[in-house]
Amino acid sequence: MSPPKYHRLDPGQRREQILDAANTLFGERPYEDVSIEDIANAAGVTRGLVHHYFGGRKEVYIGLLERLGAQREQELRPPKGRSARARVADSVSRWLDWTDANRMIWLATISHGEDIADPEVRHVVGDLVRRAVALLASFHADVAEDSARLRYALECWTGLNRTATRRWLDGDTTREATHDLLASTLEHILRTFGAAPAPRPRTVPE
């Protein structure tokens, strides 16, 4: 087979081209069934060029995870100048819009990334969760005090988010039910776990 023909692009464009091809492949097949040669052929480049920009299949997958994570963070960013309840409802709605539009790759990567045995991939997935938690805390800092307690609750919410969104995309429930669950629980977490702890009563010496 003759090597694929490709046009000269700047490094950023070439990386995006390779990630776009990987996005399609990993959305259609399990991680283990996609090879560097598959990615190169889908992108219309040589294997050597994929190795040059990423190293190997794992690095391509990690690059894709990080790009999807950045897109997810953007969708969770609430609009300014609205009530806490309206911001939560809007960000959850935009999140569901994004996952619906990108369902195949989301189900294949972020939703199941923790199931991949490679420790580096699992670490990246865990880091994406921690980043999402930190951003959620910062997005709602005007109504919720950032603390270890709040971040613990938000990390649990991201697990609920993955499960609920997966069930909806699999057709087991409705979008409305998923939105209600995610928005109401996030609002409750911000209100309950983001509240400043009550001061302990002072002990009066006898």
Where are these regions (language model features)?
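Amphipathic alpha-helical segments used for helix-helix packing
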Residues: 99-122, 133-137, 162-169
